Structure formats: C-alpha cells, structure tokens
UniProtKB/Swiss-Prot annotation:
The keyword ATP-binding applies. This is Glycerol kinase. Pathway: Polyol metabolism; glycerol degradation via glycerol kinase pathway; sn-glycerol 3-phosphate from glycerol: step 1/1. It comes from the Bacteria. InterPro entries: ATPase_NBD, Carb_kinase_FGGY, Carb_kinase_FGGY_CS, FGGY_C, FGGY_N, Glycerol_kin. Keywords: ATP-binding, Glycerol metabolism, Kinase, Nucleotide-binding, Transferase. ADP binds at residues 12, 16, 265, 308, 411. HAMAP family: Glycerol_kin.
Amino acid sequence: MSGYILAIDQGTTSTRSMLFDRNMRVVGLGQQEFTQHFPSSGWVEHDAEEIWKSVQSTIRIALAQAGISAADVAAIGITNQRETTVVWDRISGKPVHRAIVWQDRRTAQFCDELKRRNLEPLFTEKTGLLLDPYFSGTKLAWLLNHVPGLRERAQKGQVCFGTIDSWLIYKLTGGKAHVTDATNASRTLIYHIGENRWDDELLDILGIPAAMLPEVKDCAADFGMTDPALFGVSIPILGVAGDQQTAVIGNACFEPGMMKSTYGTGCFALLNTGTDRVTSSNRLLTTIAYRLDGVTTYALEGSIFIAGAAVQWLRDEMGFISVVSEVSALAEKADPNQRIYLVPAFTGLGAPYWDAEARGAIFGLTRGTGRAEFARAALESVAYQTFDLLEAMQGDWKGATNHTVLRVDGGMVASDWTMQRLADILNAPVDRPVFLETTVLGAAWLAASRAGIWPDRKGFSERWQRDCRFEPAMPEKERESAIAGWRDSVSRCLTRPQ
C-alpha cells in the first residue's frame, strides 16, 4: 500500500521521523538525540550538519520499522524548533557557523539598545513580537557582525539564511529550494505578519541584506522535491510549520476561540483569533497560527518557562521523587488544609510578566509541610501560570470568552490529577486527545491534505478524538481564594511592579 506520509519533527534536543498510513496510524518511528553546545554563559548552539544527519538517519529507521521503501511515501511534512538561526553557503551548502538556538541570550544587550532607541513599538506593530533575544532577527544580525566577511557575502547573495525548516528543505532538495513557511517567518522579527512580506525597514534597522532571505510560502504548499540521491526517489515536501503551530493544527484548533497548550519542560499556549490580528496589551505575542490557501489565521501566544521542569527540580535537586511519574500520586496525598505556593521563576517569569530577573520562591510553609505538599505545589504552579495566560488573552480579545475549551498535549497531560486541577483553576473544560503527538500529527496533516490523501480541515476535525474531558469542579469561593494566594505569591517575586 502506498500513500504513506512522512513527518519530520526536528526539536531542540532530538529529531524524530514518523510514518503514518492512509488511516492516520503510526507505522514507523525513528528518533535520535544530538549535541547541545554551550560555548559561553547564556549561549546555546547546534551543529546544523549534525541535525541534517539525524534527519537522514531517523527517516531510514522509520522506513525500516514500517517495512516500506521511500517509493511508498506520498509526501513529507516538516515541523521544527522555531527561531533557531542557520546561515549557510548557497553553493556548497555548508553552514558558516553553528546554528544559534532559540534559547540563546547573547543578543540581550543589543535588544536593550534597540529598546532604548524606542524601537520596540515598531517591531511589535509589524511582527507581533517583542524585542527579545528569543527571536531570529538579532541572532542573524550577530552572525553578520561577527563572522568575518559574512556581510559582504550576504549582500552578494552568496549565503542563505533560514530557520531549521528552511535548512532541512535546502538539504533535502539538494540545494534547489531556499524557502520557508509563514509561521516560521513570523518568528524572525523581520517579517510583517499583516502584509505577509519581509519588512525592508526592519531589515535596515538590523542590517540584514534581503538577498539572503528565503521565499515564504503557505504552510501547505509545494516546497520542493527530495533529491533522488538521498532515498532513491523524489518525494514532494508539501507541509511545513513551526512546532507550536503544528500543535494547533494537530489539536484541530481551526476555529477562532479554540486554544491549545503544550506542556513539556515549559509551556506554550496559543489561542486562535481567526483573521483578527490582535495586538496584546498584556505583552503576549501576536503570531501566525497557519496560512492556508493564502488566508492567514492569527493567534495570541503566551509562554511559560517552567512547567514540567518544576517536577524535574523535585526529582533532581530536591530528591523528593525518584521518577517523574510518581509526582501525581504524591500530590494526591497532600494535606488539603495546607496551601503551599511554588512560584517556579527559576529562569525568570515569562508571559504575561516578562520579568527576567524574578526568582523562584515557596510560600506558606509550616512544620507539617512535606514531600506531598511540594509535589502538589509544583503541579498547581502549572495550572496557575496557565490561568495567568488565559486571563491575559481574555483581556486582549473579546473572542476569548469564558466558554473557551483548552486542548492539551505534551508529557504532563498524562496525569489525570494535574489536568483536573488545571480545569478547576481555569474554570474551563480541558480536553486531552487520544493521540498525544499532536505536533508531528499537524505536520503530517499539512502534507497529507495537500496531497489529497487525508481529509480537509472539517474532516480532520471530525476525526480528532478526545480521550477525556476534565470539567471544573472546584467551588468558586475556594477557587477565588486559591488564585488570590497565587497572585500575592507572584507579586512578592517580581522585581518591578506590574
């Protein structure tokens, strides 16, 4: 049987390739970790060539596991870690420097300088983003300023810039395609998300030559054909989007007002705002959720730095649990009369506070506080932080009503206790899907729908399956008291008034 779909999920610490059949079932999986480089404090780099090798390797593993050949693959979809910045020689295809990862903070001073020049409102108006080292633009400017001769080569069109998706497409097509999609472009700090174009004014401010930029396409489009020298046949690449955006798609959040939240080490929540490009007054990001058939759908995005990492802290630093899976059962044993708050500002606080200097703290300790209370506080901190995001989104956009249903994915959502507490604090239903790998599923759908093998948006939404819906059950007075305690705790950790 042909008609298989290959989805490549290139993440921050590992690469996965997953094969789906016509019925959207997983039939093959390859996964491989790669090296993290930390050349200086706050710097994070990846070897783009190592990432490319991991993609080739995991594709071959997935094909072997499925027992099929590349000739049986109808289309490829790609999803990727966003913002990570690669520059390579247009002819040789060799990177000029290691990739600068989204986590890298080396351009913090440059961002501060741009803020002092009062340029952040301009960037936000055009890109929906904040002036932060997180995004690609200042990383690319750093490379142009620090790699000898790079600026001159860029001006002559001799080098290419791209996010990871663009780099992989270039390599997969044997150097024939230098392209990206609208979602990845929207994370660069140089793309006008209202006019869907690279912005000359922002390029000029950052000193970036337009000649090095990729062509921007819809998320489901013809991105090129794989070089037959790689797998013996040419396979069309038909779907591309950043990882948080494919999670929106994989959760079938196609209607305005639908919201997804991915819980891993951190948390990323995106609220579909339809064709409304909402400007946040709460320092949330405005981003492109997806662009299909030339129509741009926008989202409000909020990021939480510490979610599952709080549980890892209980295990690794505190020694309260041996394995992460123990935490829910331990939290259930906590004394209900104790209300302990953990503000996990281990690396500052993200949206909507954006306080990089805030530090973590624990409030409400008594002589009877033990491991169980710490476990409950760690899990509850995820719910409270999600509440902060939802409240900010509801303040920014009238479509984010109190009737919002949150669809969740990621490692933490396997815990029934955590999901129930999330529903209680949000006072909103929480839906957990049957298939939790929504990021890679979204990439597969983009390619498969373009190929005409999987159903369209309506059909895909109808096939989305819910494993469990968690309905809010906490009495309102108890909920209000709990949230008031959280707000008080956070206020004590902030370094500047909100």
